[in-house]
Amino acid sequence: MPDETNFTIEDIEPRPDALRGLDTQFLQDNTALVQAYRGLDWSDISSLTQMVDVIEQTVVKYGNPNDSIKLALETILWQILRKYPLLFGFWKRFATIEYQLFGLKKSIAVLATSVKWFPTSLELWCDYLNVLCVNNPNETDFIRNNFEIAKDLIGKQFLSHPFWDKFIEFEVGQKNWHNVQRIYEYIIEVPLHQYARFFTSYKKFLNEKNLKTTRNIDIVLRKTQTTVNEIWQFESKIKQPFFNLGQVLNDDLENWSRYLKFVTDPSKSLDKEFVMSVFDRCLIPCLYHENTWMMYIKWLTKKNISDEVVVDIYQKANTFLPLDFKTLRYDFLRFLKRKYRSNNTLFNNIFNETVSRYLKIWPNDILLMTEYLCMLKRHSFKNSLDQSPKEILEKQTSFTKILETSITNYINNQIDAKVHLQTLINDKNLSIVVVELIKTTWLVLKNNMQTRKYFNLYQKNILIKNSVPFWLTYYKFEKSNVNFTKLNKFIRELGVEIYLPTTVMNDILTDYKTFYLTHSNIVTYESSIIDSNTFDPILYPELKMSNPKYDPVLNTTANVDWHKKTEWKEAGHIGITTERPQISNSIIECNSGTLIQKPISLPNFRNLEKINQVKINDLYTEEFLKEGK
């Protein structure tokens, strides 16, 4: 157990099984605790509440349990609150339980942790500050510092009058009249529910202390009163201001939406801190609503709020939003790239940490590796116009070496944990790193020979063999070299040895037909059909559309005895076979190129005797349908 004097709730061991290590007899005697924990439904507030109820009952039952039991109970509560830190009622109950188990210091430590994990909770701040004032009255500077922190976090909330009452009470107790006046001067501009009471108290305070103010507070009163009257139409309709695991009521969502549109209206010219306070309050019940987070970030960006604040909001959204919300998370990456120039090191580090976190969530998302490689090149291998060509070449060569080493180490299962790129590569995004290596070698270093070596090397790897980016890059490379031999081979292998999505293959086939007609000539065409009697670079792509496994060689071989197949004889009528007369040496399906080499022979026929065969007795027509002959 950690030392009580330096205790914070984060010191509790984050083990997955809180009941591990407990005495068997204790577990048998407390089946309610075991069942509640083992059957805990993390998505049901009733189940979580029942768990805390059982913990409280256990504390009452044992009074002063041993350290193992205390740790187990603390761990369960910490698991709940780490997952749902906005359950302010659970923090209060946790503080009470800690007081019963350990005493005042740990109880205060829990409250201190609560305002760290839920900094916009008015209730938790009031509880924490009240406990500090009552139990640590001599720590004036520490208490005042916490009041100032709370003022910035919850002081602009519409119902924050209990906090301001406590703050004024504290400074009055210290007889610091200057600070009392400073607080009143701040409050009278804040649209609070009980604004009028504070104006009255301020005037009384000025008269009693014979103090002057530098402005007409009646004018300030009218302005504040107007703002309060305008926002009351929204404040009065808020039914659920707290966080819950259930869905937010539609009426509340619509009311919050109208409220946010009102406070962000430029024509209202409301105080920025007040608008931020409204957003913070809205995001308590609407924690899982991506649109609200996006609206908040958009407003912060428009108002030129510091990048640190915007990053903090993005990171909070990353923490709380369900994992299937990608829009905001990818928007965060774009924001970091936009702001990169303002602080290269800071934003690069945040970018790397964010990509690492996203790849753990979505390991199959190859776009993340693409974004990471762009930032890696921009940060560690950037070029500028004032650099010499030699310096630029050296940097780009170094970049390719880093890529090649990372690829080789991953394939050989020799990952270097010190190289961040190598820790991010997985089976799905390996091809993206390979493609980046190939593109840099081909387009930047202009080394076609090495590029072809990379293609030949990596196309054999099972993790890359069916990669769309890899083969599209290969296709573009061969097109740039107008290498019809390689291209024809590639087109033939599509769907046979190279398996890509049908839509991708169709796009390639369509593009290749156009490319061939544009860049080829009659000599090239004749040589290709003579070299391969079964491959026509103009007709073949058309025949292969939406039929990836089409192979003229296989089809030619199969056509030798095609007339003997049951499918042909049945002609769609299963069980009824006919042998129709037909030409056995038809020229329709022959390669037209062979017709000029020898004269066309006369047609030969098979099954001619079938012309005069006896008509089948159609019992179905005659007897069932009752039709005459």
Swiss-Prot record:
HAT repeats lie at residues 68-100, 102-134, 138-173, 175-208, 233-265, 270-302, 446-480. It is found in: Nucleus. GO terms for biological process: mRNA 5'-splice site recognition; mRNA splicing, via spliceosome. It holds the Pfam family HAT_PRP39_N. PANTHER family: PRE-MRNA PROCESSING PROTEIN PRP39-RELATED (PTHR17204), PRE-MRNA-PROCESSING FACTOR 39 (PTHR17204:SF5). One of its GO terms (cellular component) is commitment complex. Keywords: mRNA processing, mRNA splicing, Nucleus, Repeat. Function prior to stable branch point recognition by the U1 snRNP particle to facilitate or stabilize the U1 snRNP/5'-splice site interaction. Has a direct role in the assembly or function of a catalytically active spliceosome. Present with 4460 molecules/cell in log phase SD medium. SUPFAM superfamilies: TPR-like. Gene3D superfamilies: Tetratricopeptide repeat domain. Belongs to the PRP39 family. SMART domains: HAT (SM00386). The keyword Cell wall biogenesis/degradation does not apply. Its main location: nucleus. This is Pre-mRNA-processing factor 39.
